[in-house]
């Protein structure tokens, strides 16, 4: 029976002086004519296991092809070594090469490789230590989010990927068709949001959420934007703006704390590699009340520091840039902040129109280092108000009649939000570029393999 490095590293004392059998890949190799030290990784942990090969046990002539990246199967006696930095090592009794290299130029060498270089080989970069940590935390975060919603009584809803509706109204969509250009007999795109369809399912299930790929044909070449990313979108019938904000904050605080508690070693690694205060900063947010201000107040605060911005044209109705969002979180509040009641011209057509006639019941949750992490709103449930807004924006009413019809039959109103999964992972890990927290990034002018 095979053991994993993760199992052994968690309780090395249980395996002390016992025989272990492990399959994995060589990440480091050094030695001389009498003894060879091999570091092995099997993917179960970002940690490597040191394996000691001695000439009296192993025929070195049969393992002359050992090199970085080679796949092997080893058996031997494990020794727990708490007095050293490593958790233990294996004195190898047998070693079998399971996958040789065809040449000596294995892409992930034992030297510092820049993130820019690693982006050019997304099919290999997860075999570096940093990306093992990132991808393990990505997986852990994925499951913590599903666990949170299950405990809160939500139904997981699979929104369609192909759709005839642009839920955001920005027109930044990828058009899908077959070679004959008439497969659906109407314009069909990859979904930019699952929200509209989730609203339909919230009327019946009350609490639903989607967690799925999302596609935006944004040509923004920034470190925060990707053409394909994952989005978490809960929708709750009967909820007001304040209730959905409370849910958003609770979600973040719960999943962040859980990921930190369950992945201590990964965070220690990240702190050594980058932000020394990563966990302290995240846990401070998890244990704090989040400040909430109006969009109007945000503009007032930013105007007091107008000279510090590249974009100095600040007024009621302007779209806040990333530099403004980050300034609010990093220089004024020093932690995440929620902004509510945006001008309606800045937001999507479906948002509840406030009594002032100028703003909508929308919110953005901003975090340091990134800016907007979550965007959400209370939905407009009044049929005539929604229809008037859609007409004002020259939308195709016929295409959205099904969405309008949701207002006709027992609709108490609903609220929801969208949370970018990769942006959340950036915030949690301190990684600064969205291309480095997704396995195979797709951005403008870039689609490797």
Swiss-Prot record:
Name the record gives this protein: Asparagine--tRNA ligase
Assembly and binders: Homodimer.
Family: Belongs to the class-II aminoacyl-tRNA synthetase family.
Coarse class of the protein's main subcellular location: cytoplasm
CDD domains: EcAsnRS_like_N (cd04318)
GO biological process: one example: asparaginyl-tRNA aminoacylation
Annotated GO MF terms: asparagine-tRNA ligase activity; ATP binding; nucleic acid binding
Pfam families registered for this protein in UniProt: tRNA-synt_2, tRNA_anti-codon
PANTHER family attached to this UniProt entry: ASPARAGINE--TRNA LIGASE, MITOCHONDRIAL-RELATED, ASPARTYL/LYSYL-TRNA SYNTHETASE
Enzyme class: ligase
Gene coding for it: asnS
Keyword vocabulary terms for this entry: Aminoacyl-tRNA synthetase, ATP-binding, Cytoplasm, Ligase, Nucleotide-binding, Protein biosynthesis
């Amino acid at each position: 029976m095979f053991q994993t490095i993760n199992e052994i590293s968690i309780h090395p004392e249980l395996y002390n002086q016992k025989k272990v059998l492990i399959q994995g890949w060589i990440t480091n190799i050094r030695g001389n004519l009498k003894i060879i030290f091999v570091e092995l990784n099997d993917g179960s942990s970002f940690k490597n296991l040191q394996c000691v090969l001695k000439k009296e046990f192993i025929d070195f002539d049969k393992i002359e092809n050992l090199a970085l990246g080679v796949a092997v199967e080893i058996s031997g006696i494990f020794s727990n070594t708490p007095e050293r930095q490593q958790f233990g090592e294996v004195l190898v009794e047998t070693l079998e090469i399971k996958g040789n290299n065809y040449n000596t130029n294995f892409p992930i060498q034992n030297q510092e490789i820049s993130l820019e270089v690693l982006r050019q080989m997304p099919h290999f970069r997860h075999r570096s230590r940093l990306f093992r940590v990132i991808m393990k935390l990505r997986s852990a975060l994925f499951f913590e989010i599903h666990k949170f919603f299950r405990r809160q009584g939500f139904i997981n809803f699979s929104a369609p990927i192909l759709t005839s509706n642009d839920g955001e109204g920005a027109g930044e969509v990828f058009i899908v068709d077959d070679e004959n250009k008439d497969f659906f007999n109407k314009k069909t795109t990859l979904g930019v949001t699952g929200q509209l369809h989730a609203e339909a399912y919230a009327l019946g299930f009350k609490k639903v959420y989607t967690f799925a790929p999302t596609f935006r044909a944004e040509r923004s070449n920034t470190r925060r934007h990707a053409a394909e990313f994952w989005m978490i979108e809960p929708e709750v019938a009967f909820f007001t703006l304040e209730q959905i904000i409370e849910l958003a904050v609770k979600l973040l605080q719960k999943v962040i704390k859980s990921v930190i508690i369950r992945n201590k070693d990964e965070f220690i690694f990240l702190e050594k590699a980058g932000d020394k205060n990563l966990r302290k900063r995240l846990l401070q947010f998890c244990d704090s009340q989040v400040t909430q201000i109006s969009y109007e107040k945000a503009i007032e605060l930013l105007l007091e520091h107008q000279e510090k911005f590249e974009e100095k044209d600040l007024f009621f109705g302007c779209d806040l840039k990333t530099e403004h969002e980050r300034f609010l979180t990093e220089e004024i509040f020093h932690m995440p902040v929620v902004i509510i009641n945006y001008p309606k011209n800045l937001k999507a057509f479906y948002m509840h129109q406030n009594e002032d006639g100028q703003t909508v019941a929308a919110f953005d949750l901003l975090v340091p280092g990134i800016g907007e992490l979550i965007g959400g709103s209370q939905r407009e449930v009044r049929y005539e108000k929604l229809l008037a807004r859609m007409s004002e924006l020259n939308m195709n009413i016929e295409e959205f009649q099904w969405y309008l019809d949701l207002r006709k039959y027992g609709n108490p109103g609903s609220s929801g939000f969208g949370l970018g999964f990769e942006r959340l992972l950036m915030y949690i890990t301190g990684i600064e570029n969205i291309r480095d927290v997704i396995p195979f990034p797709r951005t403008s002018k870039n689609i490797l393999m």
